[in-house]
């Protein structure tokens, strides 16, 4: 999977720009606040129909403009395809091969990306919400079924929370509706939990040898998915598992009514990274946390290739120069001649010479690409 061209109109600080992309490495160089990260963000947004930097799409529209447009031509093993995203202050429109997609779940997955930025250390040391979002963003790109199940779960969760709040303040007294919601909730909570569990096991299998290689076998990395729905046997059949989830929800019905909020489900789950058996969030050094984050990102690249048959595009936002020689070497061995990569940096100093030899350089200044 490659991005051949990227066209922006009224996106962030870009009025109009076209990027003819190198099939291997694209290095965007410039001072801070010139628009390098905005270019990377536009690729991410084109892939996932949302930015990783803001939840407000209006911020993506250039100052004093009415719309923003991102268009990219992709090449796959079997041909090319344009993707388009049109953003206004009223909403957004996405197209695949010039055909408008009525649902984002039909759109996401045509362009797969892996982003590695300084804030990705928060995957290890940040809040559970950050780790859940990481799982959903990566898993959502490779499984349309998961995206749909997650959307259904979130819809039912919102309904359940609204009803619990009404029970808490006395606007409702009948719990029959809650029982109906719990039945639907249990079904989709289980689907989301099981798919996440499977995804983390696959990711761990790929991340372990990468982490061992970076640390010269001094460290062992393990991943543990930590569900709030503690089930006795995940290998049981679907109906038995749903009954177990329902039993747990019923046992805690009074607590949820008193709190006015749903206390169990995938929206409360977490992911633990362990280095040599110790929690990296609590006990890991910054170097160990950085190595863990890099191992996970490189494992994502391989997993996406396994699942969809195409390597994703790698976006490196101001992190390459921060990686030491060992980490850069492992990054290079993963991406070389396989993964199209976009890199932002203020200086090419410290970047591996082999990466530079297979790269195209773009100088970015005040929202323009200098020739």
Swiss-Prot record:
Which cell locations does it reside in? Answer: Cytoplasm
Query: Which GO cellular component terms are attached?
Result: cytoplasm
This molecule's function is given as:
The RecF protein is involved in DNA metabolism; it is required for DNA replication and normal SOS inducibility. RecF binds preferentially to single-stranded, linear DNA. It also seems to bind ATP.
Q: Which GO terms describe its biological process?
A: DNA replication; DNA synthesis involved in DNA repair; double-strand break repair; SOS response
Molecular functions (GO terms): ATP binding; single-stranded DNA binding
Please, which domain of life does this record's source organism belong to?
Bacteria
Family annotation (CDD domains): ABC_RecF (cd03242)
Give the organism, scientific name. Answer: Staphylococcus epidermidis (strain ATCC 35984 / DSM 28319 / BCRC 17069 / CCUG 31568 / BM 3577 / RP62A)
Which residues of this UniProt protein bind ATP? 30-37
Q: Which UniProt keywords apply?
A: ATP-binding, Cytoplasm, DNA damage, DNA repair, DNA replication, DNA-binding, Nucleotide-binding, SOS response
- For this entry, the protein name equals DNA replication and repair protein RecF
Q: Name the gene.
A: recF
Which InterPro entries does the protein's record reference?
DNA-binding_RecF (IPR001238), DNA-binding_RecF_CS (IPR018078), P-loop_NTPase (IPR027417), RecF/RecN/SMC_N (IPR003395), RecF_2 (IPR042174)
Q: Name the Pfam families on file.
A: SMC_N
Sequence similarity: Belongs to the RecF family.
């Amino acid at each position: 999977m490659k991005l051949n061209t990227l066209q922006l109109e009224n996106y962030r600080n870009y009025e109009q720009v076209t990027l003819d992309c190198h099939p291997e490495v694209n290095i965007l160089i410039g001072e801070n606040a010139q628009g390098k990260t905005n270019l990377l963000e536009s690729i991410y947004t084109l892939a996932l129909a949302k930015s990783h930097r803001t939840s407000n799409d209006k911020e993506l529209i250039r100052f004093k403009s009415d719309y923003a447009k991102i268009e990219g031509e992709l090449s796959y093993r079997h041909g090319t395809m344009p993707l388009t995203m049109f953003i206004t202050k009223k909403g957004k429109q996405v197209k695949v091969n010039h055909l408008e997609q009525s649902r984002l779940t039909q759109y996401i997955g045509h362009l797969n990306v892996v982003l590695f930025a300084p804030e990705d250390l928060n995957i290890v040391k940040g809040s559970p919400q950050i780790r859940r979002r990481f799982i959903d963003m990566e898993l959502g790109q490779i499984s349309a079924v998961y995206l749909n199940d997650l959307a259904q779960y979130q819809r039912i969760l919102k309904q359940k929370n609204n009803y619990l709040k009404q029970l808490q303040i006395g606007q409702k007294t009948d719990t029959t509706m809650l029982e109906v919601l719990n039945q639907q909730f249990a079904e989709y909570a289980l689907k989301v939990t099981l798919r996440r569990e499977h995804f983390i096991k696959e990711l761990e299998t790929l991340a372990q040898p990468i982490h061992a290689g970076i640390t010269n076998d001094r460290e062992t990395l393990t991943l543990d998915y930590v569900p709030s729905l503690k089930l006795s046997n995940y290998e049981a059949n679907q109906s038995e598992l749903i009954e177990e989830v329902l039993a747990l929800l019923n046992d805690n019905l009074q607590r949820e009514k008193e709190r006015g909020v749903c206390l169990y489900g995938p929206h409360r789950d977490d992911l633990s990274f362990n280095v040599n058996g110790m929690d990296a969030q609590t006990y890991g050094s910054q170097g160990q946390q950085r190595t863990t984050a890099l191992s996970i990102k490189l494992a994502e690249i391989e997993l996406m290739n396994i699942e969809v048959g195409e390597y994703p595009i790698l976006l490196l936002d101001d992190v390459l120069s921060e990686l030491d020689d060992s980490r850069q070497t492992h990054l290079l061995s993963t991406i070389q001649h396989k993964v199209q990569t976009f890199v932002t940096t203020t200086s090419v100093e410290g970047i591996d010479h082999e990466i530079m030899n297979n790269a195209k350089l773009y100088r970015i200044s005040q929202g323009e690409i200098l020739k």
